[in-house]
């Protein structure tokens, strides 16, 4: 275990030594903020970063350029050379959201030589801090070399229900919890380890990172021996604990 993590270690966890690097982020609320943080982390090491989605996400408000197109693999060279940029299929003004591309379209985009890193929001959660996937979720490109599953650590010790869990029925099936039950760390571990849980549809050979976000509010609720089960059983390659809105965003990192 290492505290106040060296950013270069996080790059290793992501498998970002190779190019192109395709990272898909799934799970609960906090995915978009994590994507932005990852973009700055990876761009700081000299990589060009493209951010997109296989679902929908709120229209970015950052200063980074945004490109809309039907087929990202056919974009002109200049559209893919910004240090950090966004690329989407369309804009849904009535929802304030952008629509992304199919996983297959992103797999084709990866073949472009301009692409160093593609960051993908590959799941929806309606901003809730916990989420289990439905039958059609998540939408992960086969070219992904790393998948990060996000969960809200501030829910540990709190009551869970449809108010703070997206896809409650699936979540209850995996964890065995009933409405208004108190969430335990073992329930999050079950969500990580279950084949229909947090890492559902992850391509073979893909690195897996479990990120417990907003961890600073629940540090005392973490039993390290229980937390490390997915790592010891090789369900994940790394566990990150932190708060994406704080500095440093990742306060603890566990790897084998």
UniProtKB/Swiss-Prot annotation:
One of its GO terms (molecular function) is ATP binding. GO terms for biological process: biosynthetic process. InterPro entries: Mur-like_cat_sf (IPR036565), YqeC (IPR017587). NCBIfam families: selenium cofactor biosynthesis protein YqeC. This is Uncharacterized protein YqeC. It comes from Escherichia coli (strain K12). The lineage of its organism: Bacteria, Pseudomonadati, Pseudomonadota, Gammaproteobacteria, Enterobacterales. The gene is yqeC.
């Amino acid at each position: 275990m290492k505290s106040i993590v060296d950013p270069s270690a996080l790059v290793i966890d992501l498998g970002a030594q190779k190019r192109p690097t395709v990272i898909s982020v799934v799970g609960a609320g906090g995915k978009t903020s994590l994507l932005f943080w990852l973009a700055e982390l990876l761009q700081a090491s000299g990589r060009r970063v493209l951010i997109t989605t296989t679902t929908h996400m709120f229209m970015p408000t950052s200063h980074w350029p945004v490109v809309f197109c039907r087929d990202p693999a056919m974009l002109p060279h200049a559209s893919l050379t910004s240090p950090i940029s966004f690329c989407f299929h369309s804009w849904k003004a009535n929802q304030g959201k952008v629509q992304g591309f199919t996983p297959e379209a992103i797999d084709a985009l990866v073949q472009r030589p301009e692409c160093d890193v593609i960051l993908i929001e590959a799941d929806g959660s309606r901003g809730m801090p916990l989420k289990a996937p439905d039958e059609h979720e998540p939408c992960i490109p086969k070219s992904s070399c790393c998948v990060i599953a996000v969960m809200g650590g501030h829910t540990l010790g709190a009551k869970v229900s449809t108010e703070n869990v997206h896809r409650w029925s699936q979540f209850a099936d995996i964890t065995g919890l009933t409405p208004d039950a108190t969430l335990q760390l073992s329930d999050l571990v079950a969500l990580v380890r279950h084949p229909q849980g947090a890492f559902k549809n992850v391509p073979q050979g893909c690195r897996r990172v479990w990120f417990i976000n907003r961890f600073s509010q629940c540090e005392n609720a973490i039993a390290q021996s229980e937390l490390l089960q997915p790592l010891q059983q090789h369900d994940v390659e790394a566990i990150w604990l932190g708060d994406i809105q704080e500095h440093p965003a990742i306060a603890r990192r566990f790897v084998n």
